[in-house]
Amino acid sequence: MNKETIKQAVAPYMAELTQMADRIYDLAEPGLEEVRSSAILTDYLGKKGFQIERGIADLPTAFRAVYEQGNGGPSFGFLAEYDALKGIGHACGHHMQGPSVILSLIHI
């Protein structure tokens, strides 16, 4: 797969996922308080057919999103952070991780 093919494949999702990243950036919720950021990500994944399990490891804003294809193929996982730094905001770039992971998931 070449660079141009990838650009064409992701183009339909770029506006909404960029908007998602911007919303998470604006919220700038610190660790363990990213309630709205978590909801943005899980709502989107739920609409794409993922089963959502919230409160993973007794962390209220942590979640697992599972997409079953039923073909017995391999399983894999992705990790995204979406917390901000207190008083600084998203200087860490975590606002981009969730939307980037979602883009990867859509294309697997």
Briefly describe each language-model feature range.
Residues 106-108:
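Conserved small/polar residues in nucleotide/adenosyl-binding loops
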Residues 2-103:
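Acidic/His- and Gly-rich active-site-bordering loop/insert found
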